[in-house]
Amino acid sequence: MRNTKPYVIAEMGVNFYDTAKVLNITPLDAAKLYIDKAAEVGVDCAKFQSYKADTIVSKNSPAYWDLKKEPTKTQHALFQKHDRFNESDYRELCEYTHAKGMDFTSTPFDYASADYLEKMVDFYKISSSDLSNIPFIQHIGAKGKPVYISVGAAYLSEVDEAVRTLKTVSYTHLTLPTIA
């Protein structure tokens, strides 16, 4: 067995939006604080999530969470609270992350995000919620970047189909599973 160091990915997600409110700073500055902390503890990669609420959920999808803790009544409204970054913001975060000596990635949840992230990410991360979205997997795989897939919320048959799909397109590396 090879003795290799684990590759640690810090899930930034969209968590920094709440930090920005608490500290009364911009979300971009809060995201950079998260990157700073990840670099301080020796993390290998900072990972974000890229989406627009309009592309991932219906405006009428009801909340599935405890409304006493989060009063937002629709999934769309909640996702919209956390989809403020654009391509320029992600480019700035990418450059900042690389300057700190870490890799940068962001899980895209739509085609537009996958496309603009192509020149930034060191690899793509596909969410387990997208493992049955074969056209999207083909789109990402065809970009030729390494691909990490999350399998936590997927059936084994979905994982198998996603892997077989990636094998049919030009990808350079596939890693699974990811552990959240």
PLM ranges: what are they?
Residues 126-144, 155-162:
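Active-site-adjacent beta->alpha loops and helix N-cap segments on the catalytic face
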Residues 8-10, 46-48, 104-106, 124-126, ...:
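Hydrophobic faces of well-ordered beta-strands that scaffold small-molecule active sites
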Residues 45-84:
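Glycine-rich, proline-tolerant flexible connector loops at the mouths of alpha/beta enzymes
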Residues 11, 38, 117, 150:
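Conserved, mostly hydrophobic/aromatic
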Residues 172-178:
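Conserved small/polar residues in nucleotide/adenosyl-binding loops
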Residues 33-49:
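Catalytic domains of carbohydrate-active enzymes, especially glycoside hydrolases
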Residues 70-133:
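Active-site beta->alpha loop and helix N-cap motifs at the rims of alpha/beta catalytic domains
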Residues 10-30, 79-82, 103-105:
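Active-site mouth loops of central-metabolism enzymes
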